[in-house]
């Protein structure tokens, strides 16, 4: 018998199953500055005590398994195990509580969102003792965040590259999202950029389909960008979607975009995966490309209140993995987003230091130290009447993206772009003059429409459009 086995036997190893809380529920534990902290919304099965359910989450997302094993004696569980260190009830819910879990930093590979999520939101979400489980927030310590490159460039470098300051950036998703030929697609891009937008965008569905192969799209969009730049004197861009079936193909598309000299590419980071996204972010930093991120598939993960993962966690993960823009809801448009919660994760994307604020869904103080910020993108069902609210809610460091709100203009794409640019400039000027955008927004738009026929036509078309549904993402 080996000495290690004898040592294990000598301390009284007993095969079988024991309660998780005996090992993984440690209310006396004082968290370390280097711990990754998680807040889980836990809904246990009937008869499962909160302490046992919280400890089970800590165990199954770190070192634990369903039974006692011999090899526990070959390592130091106290050093590596996750710990449920605090439990609190959820207001208004009888059978729900928030379990706070601390994870030692050594459990995670440096610079890998993939590895972090494999542990924290892995098999534990299928655990039978739980009816539902949702990861509400993570605290990423500087000791871990410093192992990530983060966004390829960040907010200030992007503004310097584009030479655009003092206002939100304007964008437009080209519609119809599928079915256009590359040449007609490029024409729409040119018209929108020529009309005054800063960016146009591939829809997340657009990769390389039979009706429009990626290389053709890239070429016609590059032509549109350079023509619009020459005519306006402004730097323009189009989010060329490099998302592909393999990482190698994705990088090949990004290389071609760089060779064309365009400023920005795009990636669907959830469907593409964090490993692919981090690889593309590294390529973009090394080669001077901005990186726009779409969050297609996020609602599958984050929309249910009791199970899954809140978008603020996905937003933090994106800042670590890398992206210069990410879609973040609108508050006022057709897509999900309650104001205070949305502003909470918008701050987590942009700011260096964010204090704990439960009224905005922020469970932990987050210090990003030197990790660059990400521009939030407001997109989905917005039009010129929303411009004052969007400018007031999101501020200058944002991208306001009007797809149908540009291309649906009765006079065409270029007038639609003109209407949005005039509305934005009017709102920024009014704000800078001290006017209240929340209270005077409609009047500001009406005043501007008197000297912009394009804006007047847009105001008439969308004056009755509303999306009046309650947000599901509430505290």
UniProtKB/Swiss-Prot annotation:
* Mod. after translation: The disulfide bond which can form in the large chain dimeric partners within the hexadecamer appears to be associated with oxidative stress and protein turnover.
The residues the record assigns to binding Mg(2+) are 201, 203-204
- N6,N6,N6-trimethyllysine PTM sites in chain numbering: 14
Swiss-Prot/TrEMBL catalytic activity: 2 (2R)-3-phosphoglycerate + 2 H(+) = D-ribulose 1,5-bisphosphate + CO2 + H2O; D-ribulose 1,5-bisphosphate + O2 = 2-phosphoglycolate + (2R)-3-phosphoglycerate + 2 H(+)
- Keywords, in A-Z order: Acetylation, Calvin cycle, Carbon dioxide fixation, Chloroplast, Disulfide bond, Lyase, Magnesium, Metal-binding, Methylation, Monooxygenase, Oxidoreductase, Photorespiration, Photosynthesis, Plastid
Cofactors per UniProt?
Mg(2+)
User: What top-level class of enzyme does the UniProt entry assign?
Assistant: lyase
Cofactor mode of binding and number, as noted: Binds 1 Mg(2+) ion per subunit.
Q: Does the keyword Metal-binding apply?
A: yes
Where does this one sit in the cell? Plastid, Chloroplast
Residue numbers carrying N-acetylproline: 3
InterPro entries according to UniProt: RuBisCO (IPR033966), RuBisCo_large_chain_AS (IPR020878), RuBisCO_lsu_C (IPR000685), RuBisCO_lsu_C_sf (IPR036376), RuBisCO_lsu_fd_N (IPR017443), RuBisCO_lsu_N_sf (IPR036422), RuBisCO_lsuI (IPR020888)
* Record-annotated active site: 175, 294
Modified sites of kind N6-carboxylysine = 201
Residue span(s) of the pro-peptide: 1-2
Q: Name one Pfam family in it.
A: RuBisCO_large_N
Q: Which HAMAP family match?
A: RuBisCO_L_type1 (MF_01338)
Role, per record: RuBisCO catalyzes two reactions: the carboxylation of D-ribulose 1,5-bisphosphate, the primary event in carbon dioxide fixation, as well as the oxidative fragmentation of the pentose substrate in the photorespiration process. Both reactions occur simultaneously and in competition at the same active site.
Quaternary state and interactors: Heterohexadecamer of 8 large chains and 8 small chains; disulfide-linked. The disulfide link is formed within the large subunit homodimers.
The name this protein goes by in its record = Ribulose bisphosphate carboxylase large chain
- Which species does this protein come from? Liquidambar styraciflua (Sweetgum tree)
């Amino acid at each position: 018998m080996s000495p290690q086995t004898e040592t294990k036997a000598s301390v009284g190893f007993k095969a079988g199953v024991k309660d998780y809380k005996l090992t993984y529920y440690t209310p006396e534990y004082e968290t370390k500055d280097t711990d990754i902290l998680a807040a889980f919304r836990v809904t246990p099965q009937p008869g499962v005590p909160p302490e046992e359910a919280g400890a089970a989450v800590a165990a199954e997302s770190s070192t634990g398994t369903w039974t006692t094993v011999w090899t526990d004696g070959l390592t130091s569980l106290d050093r590596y195990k996750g710990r449920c260190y605090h439990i609190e009830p959820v207001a208004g819910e009888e059978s729900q509580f928030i379990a706070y879990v601390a994870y030692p930093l050594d459990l995670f590979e440096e610079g890998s969102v993939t590895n972090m999520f494999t542990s924290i939101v892995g098999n534990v979400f299928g655990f039978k003792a739980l009816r539902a489980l949702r990861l509400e927030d993570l605290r990423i310590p500087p000791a871990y965040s410093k192992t990530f490159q983060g966004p390829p460039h960040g907010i200030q470098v992007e503004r310097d590259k584009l030479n655009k300051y003092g206002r939100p950036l304007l964008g437009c998703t080209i519609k119809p999202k599928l079915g256009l030929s590359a040449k007609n697609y490029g024409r729409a891009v040119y018209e929108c950029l020529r009309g005054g937008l800063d960016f146009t965008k591939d829809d997340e569905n657009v990769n390389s389909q039979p009706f429009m192969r990626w290389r053709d799209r890239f070429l016609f969009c590059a032509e549109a960008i350079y023509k619009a730049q020459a005519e306006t004197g402004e730097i323009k861009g189009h989010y060329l979607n490099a998302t592909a079936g393999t990482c190698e193909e994705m990088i090949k598309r990004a290389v071609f975009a760089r060779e064309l000299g365009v400023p920005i590419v795009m990636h669907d980071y959830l469907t593409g995966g964090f490993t692919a996204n981090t690889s593309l972010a590294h390529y973009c930093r090394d080669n001077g490309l901005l990186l726009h991120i779409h969050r297609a598939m996020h609602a599958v993960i984050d929309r249910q209140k009791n199970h899954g993962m809140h978008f603020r966690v996905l937003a933090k993960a994106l800042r670590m993995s890398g992206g210069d823009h990410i879609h973040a809801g609108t508050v006022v448009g057709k897509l999900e987003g309650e104001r205070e919660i949305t502003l909470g994760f918008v701050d987590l994307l942009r700011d260096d230091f964010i204090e704990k604020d439960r009224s905005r869904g922020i469970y932990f103080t987050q210090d990003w130290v030197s990790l660059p910020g990400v521009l939030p993108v407001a997109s989905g069902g917005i039009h010129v009447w929303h411009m004052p609210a969007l400018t007031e809610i999101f501020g200058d460091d944002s991208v306001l993206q009007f797809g149908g709100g540009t291309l649906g203009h009765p006079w065409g794409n270029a007038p639609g772009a003109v209407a949005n640019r005039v509305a934005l400039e009017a709102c920024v000027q009014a704000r800078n003059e001290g006017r209240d955008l929340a209270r005077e927004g409609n009047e500001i738009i009406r005043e501007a429409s008197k000297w912009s026929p394009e804006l007047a036509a847009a105001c008439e078309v969308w004056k009755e459009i509303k999306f009046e549904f309650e947000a599901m993402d509430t505290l």
